[in-house]
């Protein structure tokens, strides 16, 4: 989002568009009774990995416990992966300008020269508000996310520190 300014913007109730240097990240959280709330990680871009994970866990737990945050997240991440859903078409709820759906991890055959190889994959679906971002900008943003996920590694020491 730091490299893609349109995804740091918010659409205010009066339809003004504002851009923030630091940005919040929304996480859709399923609640009892088929309800949904958004956990908000405030200034997500300023946190290192251990801080982000700690804040994520605390924020999601608080949201499940009934806390409602002011929703100022330009992008909300949602997933039905826990239910085995591979793909979805989320909607964008203002003030957000984008919603990223992350599907469940599953195996697919990937062509590799003369043979196919099995690989674990996920499906990403990005829905965005055309008043703020165009298709080419959204494609560039989605491609950046894809590349970051493909290259993502958590050092064992950091993972162990987060668990304790």
Regions found by a protein language model. Name each.
Residues 2-164:
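C-terminal catalytic/motor cores of large multi-domain enzyme assemblies
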């Amino acid at each position: 989002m730091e490299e893609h300014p349109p995804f740091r913007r918010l659409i205010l109730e009066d339809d003004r568009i504002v851009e923030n240097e630091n940005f919040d990240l929304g996480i859709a959280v399923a609640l009892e009774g088929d309800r949904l709330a958004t956990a908000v990680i405030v200034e997500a871009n300023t946190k290192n990995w251990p801080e982000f994970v700690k804040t994520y866990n605390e924020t999601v737990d608080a949201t499940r416990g009934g806390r409602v945050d002011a929703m100022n997240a330009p992008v909300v991440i949602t997933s039905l992966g826990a239910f085995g859903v591979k793909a979805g078409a989320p909607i964008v709820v203002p003030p957000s300008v984008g919603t990223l759906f992350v599907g469940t991890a599953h195996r697919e055959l990937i062509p590799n020269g003369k043979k196919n190889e099995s690989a674990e994959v996920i499906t990403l679906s990005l829905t965005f508000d055309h008043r703020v971002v165009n298709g080419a900008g959204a494609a560039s943003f989605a491609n950046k996310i894809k590349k970051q996920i493909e290259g993502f590694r958590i050092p064992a020491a950091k993972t162990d520190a987060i668990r304790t």
